[in-house]
Amino acid sequence: NTINVITLGCSKNVYDSEILMGQLKANQMDVKHETSDDANIVVVNTCGFIDNAKEESVNTILEQIERKEEGKIDKLFVTGCLSERYKPDLEKEMPNVDEFFGTKDLPNLLKSLGADYKHELVGERLTTTPSHYAYLKISEACDRKCSFCAIPLMRGGHKSTSIEDLVTESEKLASKGVKELILIAQDLTYYGLDLYKERRLSELMTKLSEVEGIEWIRIHYAFP
């Protein structure tokens, strides 16, 4: 089997797809990113944040359903924010999708793809960005209850990744030639409050700046 992962939405989804593909590669599986030529299994990683993104996600799923009906692919799986937020509706409207998964269902998605979730793979990813830079997701989700934002509904409460694991991941990226880290999260300035009971973004950046080979660090998604 060859698995094609299609990524829609923001850089955090790109990161999630890279983690998925890293797990698949560690399971000795043939995985592609956004190519439809020779893959017989497709995973669509969706966005559900704004109307345009929802429309793009739905249209992409429908395109892949059509390809499945034409016999061009054997199986179709959908994951990500749209699937997390609207799973019952999507299952009803799109019965030709083999299975829908939410934002925290990676082990179950891997199982359906015939792979095992490997807990020991700290920082192992199949990067899709140009070789000189990579995204580094330092935390997941958000505790703020802003009336205009659905992220807590789709991603849950804020959860930081430890400084040690992020340094390990950065060292692995640097060993592959990455020179620039782009730090991403729902809210970078919240980093560390759950793990360390205080904000630790500055300490994290100091540690990352000490990683040999990393020359630039950029921060995205700060609040306010």
Regions found by a protein language model. Give the residues of each.
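Conserved radical SAM core fold
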Residues: 187-191, 215-216, 224
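Periplasmic OmpA-like peptidoglycan-binding domain that tethers envelope proteins to the cell wall
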Residues: 194-195
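Alpha-helix-loop-beta-strand connector modules within alpha/beta enzyme cores
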Residues: 198-216
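Proteins enriched for Cys/Gly/acidic motifs involved in redox and nucleic-acid/cofactor modification
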Residues: 1-191
